[in-house]
UniProtKB/Swiss-Prot annotation:
SUPFAM superfamilies: Trimeric LpxA-like enzymes (SSF51161)
EC class of the enzyme, as a word: transferase
InterPro entries, alphabetized: DapD_Trfase_Hexpep_rpt_fam, Hexapep, Hexapep_transf_CS, THP_succinylTrfase_dom1, THP_succinylTrfase_N_sf, Trimer_LpxA-like_sf
Gene giving rise to this polypeptide: dapD
E.C. no: 2.3.1.117
Gene Ontology molecular function terms on file: 2,3,4,5-tetrahydropyridine-2,6-dicarboxylate N-succinyltransferase activity; nucleotidyltransferase activity
Family: Belongs to the transferase hexapeptide repeat family.
Organism of provenance: Escherichia fergusonii (strain ATCC 35469 / DSM 13698 / CCUG 18766 / IAM 14443 / JCM 21226 / LMG 7866 / NBRC 102419 / NCTC 12128 / CDC 0568-73)
Protein name: 2,3,4,5-tetrahydropyridine-2,6-dicarboxylate N-succinyltransferase
GO cellular component: cytoplasm
Gene Ontology BP terms: diaminopimelate biosynthetic process; lysine biosynthetic process via diaminopimelate
Compartments reported by the entry: Cytoplasm
Amino acid sequence: MQQLQNIIETAFERRAEITPANADTVTREAVNQVIALLDSGALRVAEKIDGQWVTHQWLKKAVLLSFRINDNQVIEGAESRYFDKVPMKFADYDEARFQKEGFRVVPPAAVRQGAFIARNTVLMPSYVNIGAYVDEGTMVDTWATVGSCAQIGKNVHLSGGVGIGGVLEPLQANPTIIEDNCFIGARSEIVEGVIVEEGSVISMGVYIGQSTKIYDRETGEVHYGRVPAGSVVVSGNLPSKDGKYSLYCAVIVKKVDAKTRGKVGINELLRTID
């Protein structure tokens, strides 16, 4: 694996010179191998190690290099044709392979090659970009988008129209991460490498980026870029220092544990916020 990483790192340093016409065989094979490993879930752009999320930047570099070495090509679709550098993940799947890998794909869901989809996942008409990782038992609901390199945990529900931000550039940026057993409400947007920690519930229409204040009303604490585990979050506002205006924020209205989540439905958690 170190040799593969070295090839990617070296090629990335001269990425501006690489084109589909002049890409050498070693670089091309290394990039294609990484994309295949991401596609199968053998590698992932980010993973939790000793309780901390670690981003493997060299894998992001491989994804970016794939756009340098590949030319646009015609891609066949059910209702139309497309013209892009990245083929679709399921282009060569037959019924036996779908059965073996054990997930459902409802038309016209679109998944790019290089994204991993785990068993018992359901993809409603949605979009999953290259480098993303969608773990077991997750529902990606209608018109939800999982951005490039985003990491989605086990038993997550991404409701209708949810946007999970992608991140390929700038290179140092970390991917957006939704940990296990989270619920993201309809039309919410989680972007810019924000981490939603395990067991959290995000209400409908909540927008969280790195600069969004995440206000805990019980403690008065303000978080940035991270929703603490077990949080129930709704949209809100905080007043300015002079009291003349207010600005948008996300509000943690309560904390719940796994036991409470098991006894109480998502709707009840969101309705009883007073």
